[in-house]
Amino acid sequence: MNNDKADFTQGSILKKLIAFMIPVLGALILQAAYGAVDLLVVGRFGSTSGLSAVSTGSQVLNLVTFVVIQFAMGITVLIARYLGEKKPQQIGAVVGGASIVFTIISAVLFVVMVFFARPIAILMQAPEAAVDQTASYIRICGGGIFFIVAYNLLSSIFRGLGDSQSPLLFVLVACIVNVIGDLALVAGLHMDAAGAAIATVSAQALSVIFAIILLIKKTLPFTITRHDFRFNTQCPKFLSIGLSLALQEFLTQLSFLALCAFVNRLGLEASSGYGVACKIVNFAMLVPSALMQSMASFVSQNVGAGKVKRARHTLFTGIGVGLCVGCIVFTLVLLKGDVLSGFFSTDAAVIQNSYDYLKGFALESIVTAVLFSMIGYFNGNNQTLWVMTQGLIQTLLVRLPLAYFMSIQPDASLTKIGLAAPVSTIVGIVLNIGYYIYWTRKQQHPPVEEII
């Protein structure tokens, strides 16, 4: 592992942030492509009910995956902080303790997704014609949830060490296997949504095997023993960071599931169109998401090294990068959303419904660059309780009520429902600006015990 590249406490902020962010972005692009391939192949070689099933089922899988990612952020932040503090000997206990905690999380998710797949599909208000396929998709993905959780745990460890290239390799393997699996099972054997789910789980399993092999062969800045694989003093530390982030992400993703349910009431074509739009949205959010993940590691390492001003400069650098890309994505989504939707479906009604949603959502491409950069900054500063609080305000007081209100109007449209996302994000930016002012003033006179 290149120590200079992994040292964020010196050198050009812009160059090092971009160098670290590009592999993170690459991994996110492949992950988005990974999910989009399922929808694309089912949309072209499966049925409309299968397309709706993958659309709804992937929303459930996204909820689980994003919550796990945020939970794992506690591990990333803690490892980066120990590197900044020059305490690599603590990292082995972090990794060992995290392995035990995430195994338990996997077991719980396995039970819920496998044995309650059909109730979940009904709760999501999946169209009647797609309920069975939706339940099948959720059940199969639940059966392989151990691999999905393991992949995100391993990725969080490498990113905490300042290595964003290895997770890129992990997801590249998964993406290649998933494409082959989708073509074989959906296009070849006509297994529809179930085939897409099997391909997803198989790809994650092979990716985890590859990641473990790479971890064993790499030269790491820490050692780990059998005694580290237990509940230890590091567990409460990464749990205190990760739990609040996971709860916030859970409620955020729950709001998107509720949004999916609101849309499903508008019919099968609206449901399928929304599913297509969500895949495009996933791509639109890639740069802000990469910034948020990169910012947390970058800022945490600098805070651990006592370089608070450098951490602050990183925030504004990230916002600038995000806004530049966000304006381009906004223009593309707003003006060519129908063309983008056409990549995932040949059904004219589905394409139009997708584009209708994207028109309302488009502004989110710009404002999220600001919000996610600020969230990454606060995560790196261990201000995860605030990140959770502002997320709850956005979700419970703005996004959900507004989306529901729009969905029950006599002239309800996907465009109006899509507006709920950028409106709630703008509220989040205002809240975070206020907290940034408070936090900056507080850092003028920090208490000695504030650093973890």
Regions found by a protein language model. Give the residues of each.
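Small-residue-rich hydrophobic transmembrane alpha-helices
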Residues: 51-111, 148-167, 273-337, 368-390
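Transmembrane helical elements of multi-pass membrane transporters/channels
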Residues: 19-38, 140, 174, 203-207, ...
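Helix-terminus/linker motif at the lipid-water interface of multi-pass membrane proteins
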Residues: 29, 33-52, 121-128, 184-191, ...
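N-terminal transmembrane alpha-helices
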Residues: 8-40, 44-45, 59-74, 78, ...
